[in-house]
Amino acid sequence: MSRVSQTFALSTAALLLMGSLSACSTPPTPDATAQALAQGLGSLDFSAVPLADQDAASISAELTTALEPMIKTPRTVSLESVEVDEASEKPKTATASYKITWDLDSSDVDWSYTTTAALVFDDESKTWQARLDPSVAVPGLEKDQYIAKKSVAATRGDIRGNKDQALVIKRDVLNIGLDKASSTEAEWESSAKALAKLLDIEADPLVQRVAAAGPRAFVQAITLRNDQTQTIPQEKFDQIPGVLVQHDAVPLAPTRSFARPIIGSFGEATAEIVEASKGTVKAGDKIGLSGLQKEYQDTLAGTPGYTISIFDKDKKPVERLLENAPVDGKDLQITLDRDTQMLAESILEETTSDSALVAVRPSDGAILAAASGPSTNPANTALLGKYAPGSTFKVVTALAMLRNGDTPKSVVNCPATVSVDGKEFKNYDGYPTSALGKIPLSEALAHSCNTVFIEGALKAKSPALAEAATALGLNVDPATGAASFIGAVPNDSTGTELGANGIGQGVVQSSTLGMATVAASVANGATVTPYLVADPKPAAPVAAKKPLTAQEAKDLASMMAEVVDHGTLKDLNKIGGKPVIGKSGTAEYDAERNAHAWTIVTQGDLAVAVFVSDGSGGAQTAGPIAKKFLTEHK
């Protein structure tokens, strides 16, 4: 929209001139004055408007003050009509009608209204003059009043989990800080230090923020959940001059740590966010700052509304002129199960290095838990960590071998070592000598014979290994609805690299989610596509050219059952309930033979992957975590 144009201004001047030239003969029409007033209302400069016993500068100042809260909002003024009151004599009067339109936001909806101004003919000067009051700018506006637009927040949607569980909802909090207006300047520093000590936070930053704030400012120190975790009694706060405890409700997960790397945080927009938003986010707005809260901000937040009202000089509303109701945000439906996620997080609390546990429901691919250990916070190890999967990848290599003609009963050779292009590979320390030599493929997987799967990868070739990974849901683009990585298996490796790939080292990579997907695909009898956001559910990735068949999954499951029955995960064979199948894995990642520990297991409609960055071995470090999880999971 544009303001009154220069062409319009020129025509106004011309009409005024014509009016003065013809004054001697024919009484002028009020059109020129009416159009000059339209120009003045648009610019709030009335110096070119003939006024009746009024000062142009005073009128400009009065209306500028009245419109100041919205002065930067684009608006246009157009003259709609001018009607002379034929019944009037001296002075002659007329009424000018104007349409004023405000462009309130980026939408197509504007605020338009009609207003009027009184015009009187001055016999002495032979000109029409405007007689103005504040209502000429806004109907109903009186002296010493102003208009303002106030935002009306939309209700933010919840984040809900498996079976519509309430995960992120508004929960009671306490905003605790120092109200400088209710304490003396001499108390500000000592109160800030005392409050910091009570809250067990650093004192210097709070002292500095208090000093920098205005004399009547409330300086927030911390936000605490108003639940059983808040143990500081109110009387402790009351003993510190100026401390104020404000009650509020904000979107929060069940606990502070609950899926935090995935769900993310919600809070006041930073200066950087405000600047980058190009006006869509304003200082003080609360938005999603990370994770799903940020990624689905528009869905959750909805659209704020607003009101435009007349206020008196005491800032009290007098009349509401316009109301645009907010559109509430929509709930975000995800697949995390509250109890399953909390169990996974509690078990990982015992780990001292980067770790993760992911649980997937094989029947539909729903991610029920995606927990990252405390040492990885805020990193999302569960969904984004890229690591060599070690011997858990032998399930993929086993599929490539099955497709290359082997069966679980095929006799394969498991030597203690094997050489590939001059590089010697060996089995892990402590590999049972009874499982060396000629053994069934199922036994090679049960005891995790490196040399068998190195040779198997070399015979199957890299494209077949990559295709087997795709069939098990690993070598695909993620379709979870959230930031995630599944896995990467190249189709052009040869020689030593290909041999190392066959045992989950080399250049293959997987996330904990990726290996949980492999296990889930075996349990499901078909390729599983894991997903976290249930509504709207993301589109599935392109299907494998050679998808996993039910027979292939059955063969893999039978071999993984032997891993638990008498192989590297035999400590899990006493878990009650439905049968457990699995595979352990160890991936050395440096010259000192430090290793990542892995375990994948399935039981019923549950597939689990456990990863620990620094471990003594998959069965020794990750296996007990998987066992505890399956034992305690309901």
Give the ranges of each region predicted by the language model.
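Secretory targeting and sorting signals
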Residues: 1-26
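Short, low-complexity, disordered segments immediately C-terminal to signal peptides
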Residues: 16, 25-39
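Short solvent-exposed beta->alpha transition segments
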Residues: 29-35, 46-95
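Second-shell loop/turn segments in exported
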Residues: 36, 52, 103-106, 146-150, ...
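Extracytoplasmic/periplasmic proteins that interact with beta-lactams or build/remodel peptidoglycan
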Residues: 75-80, 90-354
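Gly/Ser-rich catalytic serine loop of serine hydrolases
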Residues: 156, 384-393
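Beta-lactam-recognizing serine transpeptidase/beta-lactamase-like catalytic domain environment
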Residues: 312-321, 354-386, 400-614, 618
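Short, gly/Ser/Thr-rich active-site loops of penicillin-recognizing serine hydrolases
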Residues: 625-634
